Each structure stands twice: as structure tokens, then as C-alpha cells.
Amino acid sequence: MVHDLLAFLAERMLEMNKQKQQEIKGFLGWLVGFVGAKVEDLTPKTKLQSYYEHDYDSFLAVIKKNRKKLAVDPARREPAETLQAEFEGSMGKLGPLRERIRLTDDLIDAIVYRLYGLTEEEIGIVQGETHQNRMDKNK
């Protein structure tokens, strides 16, 4: 029974991560078409590729920094409003999805900890390592 639950949760994680990647790809594809430049040609491209981890002001600052490479002027009202609307629309989809992914991940962790009979101290050690691993991946 636990195996079936873990298999179901793993399948849900895969589906939610697929949805997340589709939204990110869709937004970045729209952005390329709107600004007339490839994300790879802008700096810092990693901040644009992980736009969902930043607020709109940070996103807009990166776009403005690359103004000379763009077909639109992000300082003008109309392009800025369009950028903000699209950014917020994407974040509106990604925010709840990322939260569901986090909660599902936490549930899987809790089930595994229980399955292996880990103590609070052991869980703390595992979570500390997990946290460090996530920090390393985000560099």
C-alpha cells in the first residue's frame, strides 16, 4: 500500500514538473518573440531563465540592462505593461504549481522517513543534507 502511494505521488511530481517546464518554456518563448532577442544572447541569461524565482522588478531590470539588444524599449509604458502582464500571468500559474510540488515533495519525504523509522535527529541530518544539496544545485 505504501509503495502504491509513493508511486502515485512520484507520478504526480513528474506531471507537475512537466507542467512547470511547459509554462517556463512557453513564457520564455513568448519573451523571445516579444523582445526580438534570444534569451541566450542576454545577460545575465540565467536570471531570465529562472525568472520565476525573482520578482517583476528584478526581471525588468535584466530586460532594461539589455535594452540595446532588444527590438522593443522596455522603458516605454506599453512594452513594460505587456511584459508585466505576461510575467504576472506566468507567475500566477507557476506559484501554485511550485507550492503543490513543494508540498508533494514534503509528503514523500515524510512517508519515507516514517517508513524507515527515522528519529527527529536523523530527519534533521537528512534535511540538512537535502537543503545543502538544493543550495549547491542553485549555484
Describe these PLM feature segments.
Residues 1-139:
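S-adenosyl-L-methionine
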